[in-house]
Amino acid sequence: MIPDPRDVILRPVVSEKSYGLLDENVYTFIVRPDANKTQIKLAVQQIFNVRVLRVNTINRQGKRKRTKHGWGHRSASKRALVSLAPGDTIEIFGGPGA
């Protein structure tokens, strides 16, 4: 079990798709790869003081990239799509959901 909820949520995802999901009250975060949905839900509720309805997770495989010295890898990451209860918002983006 991860003791501190701020260790679970690493940072918000800033992309066109995540801004579009703000209209549906869904927020996207990059989370620890070993965090499960229950830990993510509890962390968001404790950090932002909101009610979480649903958590969907996406495991993204790291891409193989060419460098000057041969082949390398981007690190794999895990994203969490967090759906909030109607009326709850998180003030992290300057978008329409904020």
UniProtKB/Swiss-Prot annotation:
It comes from the Bacteria. InterPro entries: Nucleotide-bd_a/b_plait_sf, Ribosomal_uL23-like, Ribosomal_uL23/eL15/eS24_sf. SUPFAM superfamilies: Ribosomal proteins S24e, L23 and L15e. One of its GO terms (molecular function) is rRNA binding. Coiled coil: none annotated. One of its GO terms (cellular component) is ribonucleoprotein complex. GO terms for biological process: translation. Keywords: Ribonucleoprotein, Ribosomal protein, RNA-binding, rRNA-binding. Transmembrane segments: none annotated. HAMAP family: Ribosomal_uL23_B (MF_01369_B). One of the early assembly proteins it binds 23S rRNA. One of the proteins that surrounds the polypeptide exit tunnel on the outside of the ribosome. Forms the main docking site for trigger factor binding to the ribosome. Part of the 50S ribosomal subunit. Contacts protein L29, and trigger factor when it is bound to the ribosome. Belongs to the universal ribosomal protein uL23 family. This is Large ribosomal subunit protein uL23. It comes from Frankia casuarinae (strain DSM 45818 / CECT 9043 / HFP020203 / CcI3).
